[in-house]
């Protein structure tokens, strides 16, 4: 409890004792005590003064006094406040904000930021308020800049820059544009952004292309993956849709223009007066159908009650019309009564009718009813012809009379040798009676006696033949028809036999004995010549190797036979022995020689009999010592194989080899014969090279570089686990590789069976199997030497055999082939050796080029035949023979008219044509090889036609092909709208020029019937009407034809003056001038009656005949009939004066004149006329390849001035102008358009 006691004591001491103050206390952080205060205490009343820290200020002094041991503030309200700063200052293109503090006073900090597109210069972006004001300078904002922009390749730039390589400031814009045929890949313009970089990368100018357009409810025709600029694509819309603007679109830099769209076809509900339809919808889509029904008394204008919604509206137009039946004209019949007052008749109304003699109604009654139906009168043909069959001239007549209706047929039987007309056996009842008539006429026949076949005969036994009968004729043995057959056919026709049969002399292909012929014919005509050639070693009877036979009347002129040639014993040296000795020797026989009395033989030790005799030359026997030879000669392009010596003995042989790429012709061995060397071979360059190295399964070839020339070799190797069978190297020999080896899997190699000739190995040798590559030696009985054999994939090489080997037969020295290069040698050759033969210049080798030593004699002996030149080369269309020789040389060659064997000529084609194959022909043994052809270059896509559409279906067109094009609406051509592919280029198309017409012409006395338009399409017509008192003289229309107005309406003044004066008559409402067809009425005065028409009519400026007023009591009889018309009232026998009767025409006939006639003075006034209707028949339309556009009846009746619309049948196009397909019926005649 010591601590509490100390506190109490301290308090008491403070109250009672202390009055001084300690050191003045610190007041605030903003104030600093002035002076030095080092004492421990300070007396009562001492004052301490404070001043403000830097950055602060106050009004007056801040003083504290020591009172009662405490420091007390004398002015408590006085404090140090932060020193203020002025406005920090604005910077252009920037702003600032207080980052520290709430006002501009000591310690405040403002931070500047630049506006977008501007950046601050320097690193200091702030100012602080300190004791001396604002620190730092006001920051500066400068505009942001972007690097210069370079023009894109195939493009250019547009900007407001003064210089092309200057920097751009913030906000500046650069626009890009590509050259023609290119489009931008990237933005069209870029701007310098606030970050100092461009808003996007510089675009590229890429070649304009478009992908196949994707068309909603449509598709492109013949689409491709991509299209180039200005390429055009045609497209078609799906069913129920139509083109938005046009049926094609063009690839542009903006894409497909115009955009290909397919708009749905819609139709509004149809308006059908006097009819109803279903289904009833507010809107119909394309191909939607409606079915309509007409009210009672009305009928569809055309057959059928369906209409379809199309782009042209409802087709056909649904209409209900009143269709009564007019007075019927019955062909070959009449109505029982006049009934004139009952027409036109109502539907279902019936009338009794009867038919003329030989005609009956379809019911075959004597009379029947004609009924008015919605489709017209029924039956359609009221009267049909009735044919009676009761007699057949020259034929079998029926037992009883038989009746047939028009259209029915009957089969008849004529007597033998007779027939109906045209060899028919049926008659048909027609409107004119029987066809053909019932009369059998004698049938035309052909007789054997009417024909004589030289060297042939008719094979059938029949003597006479009916019309159109075919029969066979045969030729005698040794004769054939013109086409080489033994028989032919002839036909009996109206004028006799079809043709004179011919049997010509022929010879069958002969049997050749030891001869060959090039012809493949199986038969030959009279005087035909057949050349043949004997095989080697044979000759014909004349001792020649070639011959010919001729086909004559008695067959071939000779037998094509060749006989084996023979050689006789030649004249020899008297000391020369020959064996074997025979009288004659056959081709191939060998004669060997030896000398007697120890003489030395000089030359070949053997000769062979050939088709040209013995060869080589026979040897001689010499007494003296034979001479040796000096060094053998050098071989051009070759070398000797032996080591060089100074001297070579008689009969010593030296071998040669040709350098690489050279081929040896002749013997590769020469021999020293009595001091002279035999003939050297020749090394000629082999131009033929070998193709690709053959593939080796499971093997590889060591790298080598083509081309591979004659003599080049390549090496093969097998892969691991495979073993090579055969030589490692293959060699190129005359353009062909030698046989390559095989690589066989090592574990699949076959083993070789042992042989009894092998030494014993503990068990029977022939039961032992040996692996591949095993080498075995064996010894034949009675022989001291050992033989060796190796196992090669299951076969011993050489074959294990102890049979006595046949002595190898040597061939005599090779022959000297006639017309071949000198190859004289005396060296014998072993079996299998070959020698290549080289013919002399201007000679050509025939058959094999090499002779082969086989079985001790030379075989495959060729011939050297003389080269035959050729005459003038063949000419080709659109091509000529090109030649590098001078004009003089070409003229000399042309004058000679002969080209040497082997001559090569090349052809060149005219411009626009190319060679179809090799352009070179070669003269070979008097004949030229087949010449090439010059074919027209094909063309690519047809060219673009401005304001037109080219119809193309493929990407490539052959020479001469033609393509048509259509000009856009409002455009046309002055010539044919087609182009042709000519030598790789299209002919120039006709321009599609505007065919619209403007500036409608004006006429003095005529005005337009409709409002005038800005322009009119070609083919469009404009109608005019004449002013009052004028009448149109001709057509009232003019037509726009290819931008020109054609036609002129001519208005003629057809008014009339005062009507003619009539005695005893007055004129009602008389005027001084009357319009055409205006009437003036007369009235008789007093007791006078009017005779004639009471009215006169102004017609084309002239009044009709006026009436007369005279006294009469005359009455009229029945009104006279008119063609194709009748009166509307019941017919009476007597009519009082002044009685009016009305006339009406039949359906589709038009009434001309006054329909009312008046009885005056016992006579009827002028009768009207019924103008004939137009009948449109199916036959006429078929000939013109047209059809009705809206109707499908076989016959349509149209009134005068009615318009009939036609269209082309499917697959045909218009041949006449478009306006002709809207024809007008004019008084029974209509002009038909044509399609083709």
Swiss-Prot record:
Sushi domain mapped to chain residues: 19-82, 83-143, 144-207, 208-264, 265-322, 325-383, 385-442, 444-505, 507-562, 565-623, 627-685, 688-745, 750-804, 809-866, 868-936, 937-994, 995-1053, 1054-1111, 1114-1172, 1173-1235
SMART domains attached to this UniProt entry: CCP (SM00032)
PROSITE patterns referenced in this protein's UniProt entry, alphabetically: SUSHI (PS50923)
GO terms for biological process, alphabetical: complement activation; complement activation, alternative pathway
InterPro entries found in the cross-reference section: ComplSys_Reg/VirEntry_Med (IPR051503), Sushi/SCR/CCP_sf (IPR035976), Sushi_SCR_CCP_dom (IPR000436)
GO cellular component: extracellular space
Glycosylation sites per record: 775, 1100
CDD domains assigned: CCP
Post-translational modification: Sulfated on tyrosine residues.
Sulfotyrosine modification, residue list: 168, 170, 465, 473, 575, 579, 585
Keyword tRNA processing appears in the UniProt entry: no
GO molecular function: complement component C3b binding
Pfam families cross-referenced by the UniProt entry: Sushi
Tissue expression remark: CFH is one of the most abundant complement components in blood where the liver is the major source of CFH protein in vivo. in addition, CFH is secreted by additional cell types including monocytes, fibroblasts, or endothelial cells.
Assembly with partners or alone: Homodimer. Also forms homooligomers. Interacts with complement protein C3b; this interaction inhibits complement activation. Interacts with complement protein C3d. Interacts with CR3/ITGAM; this interaction mediates adhesion of neutrophils to pathogens leading to pathogen clearance.
Protein name, per record: Complement factor H
Signal peptide limits: 1-18
